[in-house]
């Protein structure tokens, strides 16, 4: 599915009747959250609020509210397409030389797709059609949402934060929430291990910290492919802009900022330009994807020097809360992306599942074709290590390939019948944990547990292992033939 920018993607959604324009005045203060929450829980359309109360700028919400729309944003039609993308990412991470003609034919489409991965630098761009600086910089002109009753204030949620470390060749793009504290100041909430925070730390430890200020740009209303690229486990040597071009089948056009050399998506609706210094402020509390309000913490203040916009710009926002919300829907879609990456490293993996009700990543379930003693433990350690996204996974449940890991009833049966709590659990202390996980004993440091719910082999148990009950196939087929005639239901 080919498109250029957010506006052209909205036209695609309109063509397929997957977006709704709401002309009734609705307040960005709590009301849009409630409407979006009800809509997403019924797998409803994306929403454009044409008249947010008190604002002239429309507000887009619930863009990624179904896995189908996530797939469309990534260039496909449905979630099956995302599995194919996972194979491309797996190839890009660890490319292999072709061994025969069949391998060459299989690789060719991948290289064809890569032709869109080169960025195109432009001198004029829609995102700079209107430029505001100095006293004209005013975030209060944007319908930034306050999502939950106890939130401290308005919160920017879908901004793509663009940074570059002093010794890096390419930029980093991350999605971090930002609290508005003044008309030209926001708090940059990023965790220490995230790319933007690492760039800032590197800058503070460099000579440049004494010579200049650390530039930051935030793209609001970027094209959906670039947004999703910022939350996708792409190879470290591949830029988000390049991967976005692959997704939307169009090269990403970028333009240099007004106030710095940072390059931003040319078709973004709004760009915030500014700088960080050593000033910090208390951030929060805010309702988060866990379904709870987070603690108040101190983070850097971003001073905004310029706002550039498209004419008739649109503000793109979301809310986060107890699943189901947009992050959990994106997590469901990206789950399909992870599977080929994991299978490339561990071919014995049959399926992998991140239940959306578990805050996207805190519990994972995997099914394997068991091959040797202790196999489940090896898989646990591998999953915790292979991708940064799984660093915060607290629970890993490993099942045999006869278990449908997308079905909690099957999982619970497997745990209740194949697990001895002492023998089949792997506990690890003092591991990285999500800063928002207040259940951990310490901030950023907690424990993990792996549960081996596979059938145990001789050497893993001294007892005779149970044989699962199954009906004969002949009988099942016979009853299938007469089932409708029985009129039981």
UniProtKB/Swiss-Prot annotation:
Reactions performed catalytically: a 4-hydroxy-3-(all-trans-polyprenyl)benzoate + H(+) = a 2-(all-trans-polyprenyl)phenol + CO2
Record-level Gene Ontology MF annotations: 3-octaprenyl-4-hydroxybenzoate carboxy-lyase activity; metal ion binding
Subcellular location: Cell membrane
Keyword Coiled coil assigned: no
Cellular component terms (Gene Ontology): cytosol; plasma membrane
Domain of life of the native organism: Bacteria
Sequence intervals crossing the membrane: none
Annotated membrane topology: Peripheral membrane protein
Cofactor(s) named in the record: prenylated FMN; Mn(2+)
Any one Pfam family match given in the protein's UniProt record, by short name: UbiD
Pathway entry: Cofactor biosynthesis; ubiquinone biosynthesis
One Gene Ontology biological process: ubiquinone biosynthetic process
Annotated Mn(2+) binding sites: 172, 240
InterPro entries: UbiD, UbiD-like_C, UbiD-like_N, UbiD_bacteria, UbiD_Rift_dom
Active-site residues, record numbering mapped to chain: 288 (proton donor)
Binding site for prenylated FMN: 175-177, 189-191, 194-195
Entry's EC annotation: 4.1.1.98
Textual note on the cofactor: Binds 1 prenylated FMN per subunit.
Subunit note: Homohexamer.
Family statement: Belongs to the UbiD family.
NCBIfam families: PRK10922.1, UbiD family decarboxylase
Name of the protein described by the UniProt record: 3-octaprenyl-4-hydroxybenzoate carboxy-lyase
Organism expressing this protein natively: Wigglesworthia glossinidia brevipalpis
């Amino acid at each position: 599915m080919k498109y250029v920018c957010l506006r052209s993607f909205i036209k695609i959604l309109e063509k397929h009747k997957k977006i709704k324009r709401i002309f009734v005045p609705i307040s960005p203060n709590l009301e849009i959250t409630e409407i979006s929450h009800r809509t997403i829980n019924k797998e409803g359309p994306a929403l454009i609020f044409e008249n947010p109360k008190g604002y002239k700028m429309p507000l887009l919400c619930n863009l990624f509210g179904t896995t189908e729309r996530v797939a469309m944003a990534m260039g496909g039609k449905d979630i099956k397409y995302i599995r194919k993308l996972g194979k491309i990412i797996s190839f890009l991470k660890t490319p292999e030389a072709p061994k025969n003609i069949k391998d060459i034919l299989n690789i060719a489409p991948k290289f064809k797709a890569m032709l869109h991965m080169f960025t195109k630098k432009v001198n004029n761009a829609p995102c700079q059609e209107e430029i505001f600086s100095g006293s004209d910089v005013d975030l209060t002109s944007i319908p930034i949402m306050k999502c939950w009753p106890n939130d401290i204030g308005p919160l920017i949620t879908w901004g793509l934060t663009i940074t570059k470390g002093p010794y890096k060749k390419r930029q980093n793009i991350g999605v971090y929430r930002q609290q508005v504290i003044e008309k030209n100041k926001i708090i940059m909430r990023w965790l220490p291990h995230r790319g933007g925070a690492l760039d800032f730390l590197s800058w503070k430890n460099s000579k440049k910290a004494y010579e200049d200020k650390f530039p930051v740009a935030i793209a609001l209303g970027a094209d959906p492919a670039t947004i999703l690229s910022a939350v996708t486990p792409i190879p470290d040597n591949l830029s988000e802009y390049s991967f976005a071009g692959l997704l939307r089948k169009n090269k990403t056009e970028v333009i240099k900022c007004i106030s710095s050399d940072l390059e931003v998506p040319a078709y973004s609706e709004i760009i915030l330009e500014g700088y960080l210094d050593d000033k910090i402020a208390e951030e929060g509390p805010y309702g988060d994807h866990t379904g709870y309000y987070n603690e108040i913490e101190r983070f850097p203040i971003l001073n905004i020097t310029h706002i550039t916009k498209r004419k008739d710009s649109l503000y793109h926002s979301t809310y986060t809360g107890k699943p189901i919300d947009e992050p959990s829907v994106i997590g469901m879609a990206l789950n399909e992306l992870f599977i080929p990456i994991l299978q490339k490293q561990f071919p014995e993996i049959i399926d992998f599942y991140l239940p959306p009700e578990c805050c996207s990543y805190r519990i994972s379930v995997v099914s394997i074709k068991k091959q040797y003693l202790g196999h489940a433990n090896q898989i646990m350690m591998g999953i915790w290590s292979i991708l940064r996204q799984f660093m915060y996974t607290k629970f890993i449940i490993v099942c045999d390939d006869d278990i449908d890991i997308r079905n909690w009833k099957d999982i619970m049966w497997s745990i209740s019948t194949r697990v001895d709590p002492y023998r089949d659990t792997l506990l690890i202390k003092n591991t990285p944990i999500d800063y928002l996980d207040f259940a951990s004993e310490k901030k950023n440091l907690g424990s993990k547990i792996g549960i081996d719910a596979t059938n145990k082999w001789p050497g893993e148990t001294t007892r005779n292992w149970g044989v699962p009950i199954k009906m004969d196939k002949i009988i099942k087929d016979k009853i299938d033939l007469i089932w409708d005639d029985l009129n039981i239901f």
